[in-house]
Amino acid sequence: MDHRLSPELDELRRTVEAFAHDVVAPKIGDYYERHEFPYEIVREMGRMGLFGLPFPEEYGGMGGDYFALGIALEELARVDSSVAITLEAGVSLGAMPLHLFGTEEQKRQWLPKLCSGEVLGAFGLTEPDGGSDAGGTRTTAVRDGDEWVINGSKCFITNSGTDITGLVTVTAVTGRKPDGRPLISAIIVPSGTPGFTVAAPYSKVGWNASDTRELSFADVRVPAANLLGEEGRGYAQFLRILDEGRVAISALATGLAQGCVDESVKYAAERHAFGKPIGTNQAIQFKLADMEMRAHMARVGWYDAASRMVAGEPFKKEAAIAKLYSSTVAVDNAREATQIHGGYGFMNEYPVARMWRDSKILEIGEGTSEVQRMLIARELGLTP
């Protein structure tokens, strides 16, 4: 398989690389330390068309694909993951469900605003008692005439409480199967709907310039037409969304891993000890060689999964492999980058400190490492 980028994708990569270094890098540290959402940066990403990368032009998109999104995510995450996860969640979790499962009316209503970055969408799946048990949904939606009445709560929801958040698509139990198992459906809840409460932002270890909230629904009424896809198919729909999202998270994790290499190579050339740059020491060189090797192989993994996805081939196993490996690599490279920087790696003014804090969530969000191993084993034909 040829993993070299086409001229168009390489141009996109270079454009986002320049944006990340020229616009994001000088500003993001201050946003991060203030735990402040970077509206200025997000607006510029919208003007660049990044939120519309994988969507058709007829809905305001750029006419690209998921591979293009991955390229943008990797380049952003080489500099900062808060900005990258805002794009990832806005596209793969906020807008993609509407594109894949929405009615024509829903697409016309929401996608142009989502593709332009004027509005952010969010994905409400995880619940306080759920975690990896995504099927254990307790939020309910009861049909009352031409409306759904929603009650319940969601947690750890990215992009759900910004000033430009326009909607959250939530999963809710809408009935029971003959055997008693829940029928889970997906329903669009516009921001500001009465009874829909967004809590204050979480105080997080990392991703401090991104928006993450807990959501509560108390007799929230939305039109019956806000059902996304078929009733009872919400869980299956979001399993597909999560498969695709794992490829995007893998690209993001690869970017963080590569960013650790970038910063460490630069520091190793500048930092002198015992009369010479520390990069001349074999111990440092071997660390950097291993870090580059890991980042490179993580890139091969997500390129493979994304290539299969856009070609319409099965990619579930490859997505799980890419997500598992790249997130592990991100944590490993962040740890080694901090070690290479020594005491300075523990100081917040150095980007590697931010990368270290941001890396761990990649082994948890959008499917833990343990869940990825379960998925891989299942794809190998193994059952519990």
Task: Mark where each language-model region is.
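A short, Trp-centered hydrophobic/proline-enriched beta-strand micro-motif
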Residues: 117-125, 170-171
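Short Ser/Thr-interspersed hydrophobic loop/turn segments at strand-loop and sheet-helix junctions
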Residues: 49, 73-77, 172-173, 189-194, ...
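Alpha-helical interface subdomain recognition
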Residues: 1-89, 101-106, 113-118, 131-134, ...
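Short Gly/Pro-enriched turn/cap motifs at secondary-structure boundaries
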Residues: 87, 114, 129-132, 158-163, ...
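Flexible, small-/acidic-enriched active-site or ligand-binding loops
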Residues: 136, 192-223
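A short core secondary-structure module
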Residues: 151-197
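Flexible, glycine-rich active-site loops centered on histidine and acidic residues
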Residues: 95-101, 123, 135
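Long, acidic (Asp/Glu-rich), low-complexity accessory segments flanking structured domains
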Residues: 218-236
